[in-house]
Amino acid sequence: MEVTLLSLLESDLPFLIEVRNDESTRSQLGNDSLFTLEDSTQWFKKEQPEWLLIINHNLTRIGYMRIDGDTIGIDIHPNFRRKGYARLAYQKYLEDTDYADLWVFEDNHAKKLYEELGFVETGEYETLRDRKYLKMIYEKWK
């Protein structure tokens, strides 16, 4: 099993919205708002994000990687969760990265994955929707 990371294109936005607006995705994000395709298209054209599409060996869209400077995160389509795709995508991305950070709710199952990948808690957190939202960092040289 392998994944490929490709630049997210405007034509991928309907897929992004399908994943992003799923309740199981939104519940784990700092911003749990619903977005329309129109909202996303305007955002995409204005921000020109360096986000990545995650595809599998069959060229099926699996999810996407959010990148904002050093801050990263992955959202996987519900049909492909718990199959190792997020781990593979993070590993591929981190191969060429010395530092990255992310935010995760303390009760998110993915926190264990982040720890296994080498992310550590910084002690910094926010309280969102009555839950702790923790900052974790990855430093290759440690």
Where do the protein language model's features map onto the residues?
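Hydrophobic pocket/interface hotspot
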Residues: 16-17
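Conserved beta-strand in the GNAT
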Residues: 59-75
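Conserved acetyl-CoA-binding loop-helix of GNAT-fold acetyltransferases
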Residues: 82-95, 112-116
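Conserved beta-strand-loop-alpha-helix junction that forms the acyl-donor binding cleft
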Residues: 102-115, 119-120, 126-132
